[in-house]
């Protein structure tokens, strides 16, 4: 299957922050494909902190065969920084089809074209599916840290030109 990214506008993120579907999205979204309200809120804060974001910071993952939204992904830190952090999630019904791997590769392209040289993804060591995603996308394990919310996470980096 093939996938692409659909950028989320500020108005889309505001609707998601209010736990509502953005206009025109409800018929295209598979169950559990929309980002949670706290993710939309973080994206709005990130966009507000940037004077004028050159590119969107948040995206929906689109399955091209039927144009349905199957997940979401985006940047957790500002584009243009040397290292940017990304996050992603795919609806259970669409997992195992390459959506997250493709989305991660496309996010890395956006990051590198915006001046970043490294993309960071943090993954819980027991999240086998996500560990496979970062490995398939070309990320390399560089360390681990204890997150106050998520506990132990492994840190995976993809460098520009890798």
Go through the PLM ranges and name each one:
Residues 1-85, 90-93, 110, 114, ...:
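GNAT-family acyltransferases
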Residues 119-123:
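Conserved hydrophobic beta-strand within the GNAT/NAT acetyltransferase core sheet
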């Amino acid at each position: 299957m093939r996938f692409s990214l659909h950028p989320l506008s500020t108005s889309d993120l505001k609707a998601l922050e209010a736990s509502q579907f953005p206009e025109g999205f409800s018929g295209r979204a598979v169950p559990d494909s929309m980002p949670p309200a706290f993710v939309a809120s973080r994206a709005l804060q990130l966009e507000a902190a940037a004077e004028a974001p050159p590119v969107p910071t948040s995206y929906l993952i689109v399955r091209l065969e039927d144009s349905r939204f199957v997940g979401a992904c985006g940047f957790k830190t500002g584009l243009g920084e040397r290292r940017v952090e990304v996050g992603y999630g795919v609806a259970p019904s669409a997992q195992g089809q390459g959506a997250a791997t493709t989305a991660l590769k496309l996010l890395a392209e956006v990051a590198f074209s915006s001046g970043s040289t490294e993309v960071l993804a943090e993954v819980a060591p027991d999240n086998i599916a996500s560990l496979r995603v970062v490995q398939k996308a070309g990320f390399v394990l560089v360390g681990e840290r204890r997150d106050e919310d998520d506990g132990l996470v492994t840190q995976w980096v993809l460098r520009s030109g890798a």
